[in-house]
Amino acid sequence: MTSHLLKAEIHCHLEGAAPPALVVKQAEKYGIDTSGFLRDGQYVWSDFAEFIQCYDAVAQVFKSDEDYAVLTETYLTELAEANTIYSELIISPDHGDRIGLGADAYLAGVAEGIRIAKEKTGIETRIIVTGERHFGPERVIAAAEYAARIRHPLVTGFNMAGEERMGRVADYARAFDIARDAGLGLTIHAGEVCGPESVADALDLVKPSRIGHGVRAIEDAALISRLVETGTVLEVCPGSNIALSVYPDFASHPLKALSDAGVRVCISSDDPPFFFTSLAREYALAADAFGFNDAEINRMTRTALECAFVDEATRERLLARLGDA
């Protein structure tokens, strides 16, 4: 049992955390037919491309800043109830623009949900702005420029997500230069759908402190040595990897092998209801499927806090809470 352990999550896409029950309620509010992507309380998709389409359909039921405040508060409250003390939410200003809300109002809604959740539960949260790779380099660069320009106190990181097979990392490197120059923490999705070469490209061209997923690095011993040497943290999401058939089962998943090799790893839920999981389940899997003991799981939580995109005073406060638990 891991319910008693304090938890931290640094890889979760906000719209991907939308509970099906909330999506149904939102769809009724706006008269949206959900039958194409939500049936019997579960999201419907069969491969990565369909997952992206389903994700986008779910996101369409959130149309106002108030909607985003409700979504954010709902998810963070769920995390807090599972003993989570820190969360980073990945959001896309592109989505705010596409639905006609605008990036500023979209961000304001998320920030309000964070405020309410912290007031209710004490959970600490930061925001990672992401560019969507499948929209092309110009849109990813625009997302980085927005994150750099907005100077929002809760926006502390920049990411690139989306279809990993779209374009070369080099095509998007300028976006990360912009974010780095603005003082934002850097993370990038790599080594999930694509192999270890995508992780190597990320290290060479982006030089992030963290990599989203990165599990395919296990296929290259030299790359593993490099990750150990650089101390780059892998944001590992086992339930997501199984659901998307990156690995056939947990016995095949390399989380334990990565940890045993000395790679810094932590665990997150990615898009939890899409992958029939939750952060609480990911922590339980760490024990039940991978054989980590409480001390080893706490070490992964400590890693998440050590590499979190927060100011040092907040980091020390969070680490002290973990140390006192």
Swiss-Prot record:
Keywords: Hydrolase, Metal-binding, Nucleotide metabolism, Zinc
Cofactor(s) the record lists: Zn(2+)
Keyword Hydrolase attached: yes
Catalytic function, reaction form: adenine + H2O + H(+) = hypoxanthine + NH4(+)
Enzyme class: hydrolase
UniProt binding sites for substrate: D271
Residues carrying the site annotation Important for catalytic activity: H213
Active site (record annotation): E192
Residues bound to Zn(2+): H11, H13, H189, D270
Pfam families: A_deaminase (PF00962)
Note describing how the cofactor binds: Binds 1 zinc ion per subunit.
One of the GO BP terms on file: adenine catabolic process
Single annotated GO MF: adenine deaminase activity
UniProt KW Hydrolase keyword: yes
This enzyme's EC code(s): 3.5.4.2
Family assignment from sequence similarity: Belongs to the metallo-dependent hydrolases superfamily. Adenosine and AMP deaminases family. Adenine deaminase type 2 subfamily.
Function comment: Catalyzes the hydrolytic deamination of adenine to hypoxanthine. Plays an important role in the purine salvage pathway and in nitrogen catabolism.
PANTHER family to which the protein is assigned, alphabetical: ADENINE DEAMINASE (PTHR43114:SF6)
Designated name of the protein: Adenine deaminase
Organism from which the protein derives: Agrobacterium fabrum (strain C58 / ATCC 33970)
